[in-house]
A protein has these predicted regions:
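NTP-dependent small-molecule kinase module
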Residues: 133-139, 145-204
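Hydrophobic anchor at the beta1->P-loop junction of P-loop NTPases
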Residues: 5
Length: 204
């Protein structure tokens, strides 16, 4: 089973991908962050430059993950991905009209990506602003990230309505570092039960 986790910047995608991957013990494919990406990408995102190049870069990154998964997927497995074709489409909202046609051509990279579920995370801007400030990344300007989140989140909500296997989950009040938050996601997305590792009280 393949599950894509998508949403605007600062929503908690990377955390949820890692946490659910660990919970299911089947692996997860994140998009990474600073240190993984080409150093020019973050600067171009912050400055609103090179929209087609940025979009193509993330499309190629996601595509590498999907190609690698093909050799690891199997019946009974649940594999989580950060990002999907809908991600590339949602981010188009932050770029000018003159770039839209070129951006649409880049979308073709994601035509072969398939999922059993797409979890679309959304939340209030207050929650996102809190998470952005908590992660305290020096290369992120909180006000700009919140502005971008509003644009991208609105696009995700609209796009999700046309995806037959998308489930929109409002993450306000959900903590992805707590079992209760992860269980809420599993239930809302109708994912199969994860295997429990038994914990026992044992005498010395």
């Amino acid at each position: 089973m393949r599950v894509a986790i998508v949403g605007g910047p600062g929503i908690g995608k990377s955390t949820l991908v890692r946490q659910l991957g660990d919970l299911y013990h089947n692996g997860a494919y994140g998009e990474g962050e600073k240190g993984v990406w080409d150093p020019r990408v973050l600067d171009d995102i912050a400055q609103g430059r090179n929209p087609v190049g940025v979009t193509e870069y993330f499309a190629a990154l996601y595509d590498a993950n999907y190609r690698d998964c093909a050799s690891n997927d199997a019946p009974g497995k649940v594999i989580f991905f950060e990002g999907a074709r809908i991600t590339l489409e949602a981010h188009m909202a932050e770029y000018p009209a003159e770039c839209q046609e070129s951006l649409r051509r880049v979308l073709a990279i994601g035509d072969s990506w398939t999922f059993d579920r797409i979890i679309v995370l959304t939340s209030s801007t207050a929650t996102v602003e809190k998470h952005i400030k908590l992660r305290n990344r020096p290369y992120e300007v909180a006000e700009n990230m919140v502005r971008r989140f509003r644009l991208i989140d609105a696009a995700f909500r609209q796009l999700a309505s046309r995806e037959h296997n998308a489930i929109v989950i409002d993450r306000d009040g959900m903590e992805f570092h707590e079992r209760s938050g992860l269980d809420a996601i599993v239930q809302a997305a109708a994912l199969p039960k994860y295997p429990e590792i038994p914990y026992r009280d044992l005498a010395c």
